[in-house]
């Protein structure tokens, strides 16, 4: 760990269409090689598809999907006397959101739909209903923490 003073959290500007910092952060995570306008096009296109399929505001469905993906606990490796234990720890609020976004993006990219807009829209819809691969990842994370509950006293 650094001995210097801790890094200052930068404030992120909200996006133009929904005026939301969460959406802006998601677009930044979605962006590849600095192509922000492409990432915005993908996200807004996906939200249009979601709105067409659900007749609900797309950003509302997106936020519901993120809430369904946020993990409460995760495991961290801790080495004690030559043995490595998977110790369950509670996840900080900002990390919960970051993990949910990361999982949503990565499992969207793995889907079989034609365009990234369609892939993202399908994964958001699935996650908002509590299904899909991203939700499965969250449940696996929770299951792993539950299985290693015996090592919780090794927390640091």
Curated annotation (Swiss-Prot):
One of its GO terms (cellular component) is small ribosomal subunit. Pfam families: Ribosomal_S7. Transmembrane segments: none annotated. GO terms for biological process: translation. InterPro entries: Ribosomal_uS7, Ribosomal_uS7_bac/org-type, Ribosomal_uS7_CS, Ribosomal_uS7_dom, Ribosomal_uS7_dom_sf. Keywords: Ribonucleoprotein, Ribosomal protein, RNA-binding, rRNA-binding, tRNA-binding. One of its GO terms (molecular function) is rRNA binding. Part of the 30S ribosomal subunit. Contacts proteins S9 and S11. NCBIfam families: rpsG_bact (TIGR01029). One of the primary rRNA binding proteins, it binds directly to 16S rRNA where it nucleates assembly of the head domain of the 30S subunit. Is located at the subunit interface close to the decoding center, probably blocks exit of the E-site tRNA. Belongs to the universal ribosomal protein uS7 family. This is Small ribosomal subunit protein uS7.
């Amino acid at each position: 760990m650094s001995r210097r003073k801790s890094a200052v959290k930068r404030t992120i500007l909200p996006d133009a269409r929904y005026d939301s910092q969460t959406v802006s952060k998601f677009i930044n995570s979605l962006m590849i090689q600095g192509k922000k306008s492409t990432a915005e096009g993908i996200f807004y296109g996906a939200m249009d598809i979601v709105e067409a399929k659900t007749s609900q505001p797309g950003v509302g469905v997106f936020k519901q999907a993120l809430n369904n993906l946020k993990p409460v606990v995760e495991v961290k490796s801790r080495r004690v006397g030559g043995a490595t234990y998977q110790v369950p720890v509670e996840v900080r609020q900002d990390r919960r959101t970051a993990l949910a976004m990361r999982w949503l993006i990565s499992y969207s990219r793995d889907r079989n739909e034609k365009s990234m807009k369609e892939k993202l829209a399908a994964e958001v819809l699935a996650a908002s209903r509590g299904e899909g691969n991203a939700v499965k990842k969250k449940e696996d994370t929770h299951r792993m923490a539950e299985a290693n509950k015996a090592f919780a006293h090794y927390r640091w």
